Amino acid sequence: MHLPHPAAPRHFLLRSSLSLACVGLAPASAQTTSESITLPQVNVTAKALPADRATNGYQGRAASVGTRTETPLLELPQSVNVVTRAYLEDRVPTALDEALSGISGIRQGNTLGGTQDALLKRGFGTNRDNSIYRDGMQSVQARNFTPTTERIEVLKGPSSMLYGIQDPGGVVNIITKKPLLERQASVSGWGTSFGGGGAQVDLTGPIGSHGLAYRLIADEQRYDYWRNFGKIRQQVFAPSIAWYGGATNVALAYEHMEYSVPFDRGTQIDTTTGKVLAIPRKRRLDEPYNVTTGRSDSLTLRADHRLSEAWSLRANYGYSSNYYNDYQARAMSFNANTGRLTRRGDATRDAKQDAHILSATLLGKLRTAGIAHELLMGVDYLHNYRVLGDLMRDRPNDSNFNVYDPEYGKMKLPSTVSAADSDQTDKLRSTAVFLQDTVYLGDRWIVTGGVRYDSFDQVTGKGRPFRTNTHVNDGKAVPRLGVTFLLQPRWSVYTSYSKSFRPNTSIATAIGELPPEQGTAWEVGTKWVGENLTATAALFHIDKSNVQTSVVVDGTYYTRVTGRARSRGLELDLSGQLTSAVSIVGSYAYLDAKTTEGPILRGLPLDGVSRHTASAFVVRDFGAVSAGRLRAGAGLRAHSKWGAGDGNGKVYDLPSAIVADAFVAYDAPLFGQRVTLQFNIKNLFDKTTYTSNSGLGSPAIAMGEPRQFVMRAKVVF
């Protein structure tokens, strides 16, 4: 069956870039091995090699996500985690939630059938919640963990003082690979036991001898989906250029992605038993045309200028976009007596989201009355526009699909455009000013305080003709205050108070003007940042108020903001080296998250939240073995049972799980180049796992991948 394909992969473009990159390897290699390159002395800031200060192997040392300036983790009065490049290379994740599986308090959210990034942070969050950033700028891309990822920073708790409109769970900031003034080149390829694999080229180095550098990353992935049908396709082309001019640094980066992924909402819950259907986990309940195809683009322009030894200016522009079409045979209801599933043909065509971000900040260091201050002040502008064009909603026209004896191919593609549901629109404009002051009181006390004022205009609605269901034009001030005390040069304790907000809007129904959702959090914790090991312990309490609820008065539904939710718990994180040969990333979280007020959901746990989660991944470096170096690692990921709600007061319990992973890697020289061979086993004991609720109102449950073998080879020139 021929399917409409809105973003046919530009194979010529990708293959041309791969060929060009490979041609560039020979001279780069020859120059590196046959002659030394002498560059003029250039005052290169940390922007050129950002990982040197921020990470050390598995250890995170500093991050920019917590203050919008690179700050030692020890001084930050909130819980901040860093997922390092070394850890990502050992674990070889393919999605953002998998990359963050070693961080406490983070779980997969509703990924819209595996087509969107979605993270629960301390119990809050969903897909397209604007909590994912790339190099400090908001991203609307569906798939943010790409081959350009250098490391990932996670700030937990309310963060509206720094990032504006947000849920109170936190934000994730992906730091991308930057052009380097040192010539490097690598080619890698991998294969999976699911069938298929991928290849990547990464080139970087100087252009001339005056501080100009480039980077080019090209990647293609083609492999089979692990269930009984489906294929995953992804192509990335990412050139960037930077000038490190001493007092002035300028960087321009572009990334283009085209993708085609299964739209798979997973399995179903039998509501008569409250348990997942007793069918093989590989069996899909939709059709082969359940596919999302799309493309995304990201463009960033950054300029930093040092005005003096104490003051610097930064200006950023970011553009992020995502365009997609999807088709699905959507499960609507299940008859437990007959085993038949009623399905409806749904589709979204010409869905697009764009975000334009402008930011200007002034950073200064000064002393007043003998007290040191680090000031950050700035202006942010955001224009985020999302519209879902044609919404197709066929009548439930297939009630003959038997989940125990399925026959595929009998349900036609959706074809009925719903005028009432089409052109679903969410348009947000926001302008903000902010001021943050970090005060150093002597050698031990650090006080960080700030305030932000956001002026925003948001319009939502749908339909042909278009109907505006929400128009909010308002402003909101949000504060932040934190205190850090250095018990020792490497050990600190901290406490913080922070707030968040999000306008109350509705695309589906008119709700009038309602006050925004608000999040308020208190947090206390302690941190140890040693030479090779970082440890964090945090206790937190988050209240979320003004949550939308529906009430019925004389048979009429009204929307009110009487709902409240609460999240509180304990988080422990450890990363770095235990010894010179043993590295670890470990975490544990206890999370009590539930709805505390509301006519239907009061007292129920927040969707998708496990009360207990834990992970540990330990790596041993065996040193020299024969002509190379041998490393091996293994670990566990575990969570307690969690609840999937139907939105109407019913919560279904999903079982706990413990999953093991392992890898072995061998580095050795070959023909004068460094070659790495790596073998990973994911889900070593082939456990069946359930990862998230994939549709509110429908008991559909996303499933974790079975055991997978991944073989990878990399050559560094």
Enumerate the language-model features and the residues they cover:
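Acidic/polar loop-and-plug regions of large Gram-negative outer-membrane beta-barrel proteins
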Residues: Q221-Y225, A238-R306, Y319-Q353, P396-D426, ...
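Acidic, small-polar-rich N-terminal luminal/periplasmic segments of exported/outer-membrane proteins
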Residues: P40-E182, V524
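Gram-negative outer-membrane beta-barrel transporters
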Residues: H541, V561-D646, K714
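Surface-exposed extracellular loop regions of Gram-negative outer-membrane beta-barrel proteins
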Residues: E258-T272, H383-V387, R480-W528, T534-R560, ...
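Conserved C-terminal beta-signal and adjacent last beta-strands/turns
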Residues: Q31, A351, L375, W522, ...
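Outer-membrane beta-barrel translocator/receptor signature
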Residues: T148-E150, M161-P239, W243-N249, D297, ...
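Structural signature of Gram-negative outer-membrane beta-barrels, strongest in the C-terminal barrel
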Residues: A238, A242-Y244, Q353, A372-L376, ...
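Membrane-embedded beta-barrel scaffold of Gram-negative outer-membrane proteins
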Residues: D304-G318, N322-Q328, V493, P516-Q577, ...
